[in-house]
Amino acid sequence: WWQALAAVLLFDPLAVLGVGTWLSFGLVAALIWACAGRLYEGKRQTAVRGQWAASVLSLVLLGYLFASLPLVSPLVNAVSIPWFSWVLTPLALLGSVVPFAPLQQAGAFLAEYTLRFLVWLADVSPEFAVAAAPLPLLVLAVCAALLLLLPRGLGLRPWAVLLLAGFVSYRPEAVPENEAAVTVWDAGQGLSVLVRTANRHLLFDTGTVAAAQTGIVPSLNAAGVRRLDKLVLSHHDSDHDGGFQAVGKIPNGGIYAGQPEFYEGARHCAEQRWQWDGVDFEFLRPSERKNIDDNGKSCVLRVVAGGAALLVTGDLDTKGEESLVGKYGGNLYSQVLVLGHHGSNTSSSGVFLNAVSPEYAVASSGYANAYKHPTEAVQNRVRAHGIKLLRTDLSGALQFGLGRGGVKAQRLRVYKFYWQKKPFE
């Protein structure tokens, strides 16, 4: 085990940063821990013990790495581990040294449809979301998993179960009353904003398919979001609603959209106000215009908590912004503005920036994106107004606290050591 790990790290030192390395070597270590040195055990007992070891440790690793636990994981492991070990891997190795086409084709066929089946099963199987636990609790959970794999006579398993229960049931600290926690996710060249109050959650847009599956949904699980009280889809564009199917697995209290005809059961984000836990929410709507494109139909959301405000405009263009200014005027004032259309030249006009007069402007854009968002013109315009520009492509996800004390901003990507900092930051 140690030699294999050393060989992998020798040829690819960065493999230690990969999830696959931790899962592969972690589960093999669990098998060795549970099965090595056991006397007077038959093959069936050894197989059951190995399955038990893989399931217990994967519970901790999957919960920490992906913030969710596939409930069918133990059953899938019980079937797939011997299938890969005794069928697919031998066929692949044999096909690499024996130039016999039917054998190679059979191996490729079985491997392809096995992976297709596993991907399908992952999509349809229920999952249990796990909040991101602090490091001390994670260490205790790993110790608990190892205790569960010790011989039964030691009497430590009940304590291990208690520790694992604490890991699985952990919930992050709640947002205080009359305050809001806002997270602008790093959704690549897309947009997704989570607004949390003491007891409620609203998600504005879902980003792209890839961003939702690999980042947003796991991040929602890690944040302890078990239900979305409102899901807002600003308009029908893949960088704003591409992750709808993935996020749609999370229960929600209603879907609101700028183009509700594209989503079953959705309602239009027309002008309406509501309050959650002392925090005011309002959908703003530009004046009616003719020949509006999809971007111009974007939902516009304003959130006010203790006098501090957030404004999100989706992909609203400059004409829509000017319409908002004419309709709402100084009531648009917000300390945090998520720039329209990822910082494109089609949004963030000088008139609009004057009306909103934000302290922070956030550009949700992908690193080195082909559109060069946020554009140089928008950056210059923002800085000319004395506004601090924050970018998800450089800083990752951004978090804002709204309350009576004003706005507190921080980035979620925290570097502890100087060598972890990227050159472009």
Give the ranges of each region predicted by the language model.
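Membrane-interface micro-motifs in multi-pass membrane enzymes
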Residues: 1, 16-27, 342
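Transmembrane helix-bundle segments that form internal channels/tunnels in multi-pass membrane proteins
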Residues: 6, 10, 19, 29-183, ...
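Core dinuclear metal-dependent hydrolase active-site scaffold
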Residues: 7-16, 122-230, 264-336, 394-425
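Active-site environment of divalent metal-dependent phosphoester hydrolases
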Residues: 16, 210-211, 236-242, 262-264, ...
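A short helix->loop->beta-strand "cap" motif at the edges of active sites that frequently abuts
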Residues: 200, 251-260, 357-360, 385-387
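Active-site HxH/HxHxD metal-binding segment of metal-dependent hydrolases
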Residues: 232, 238-271
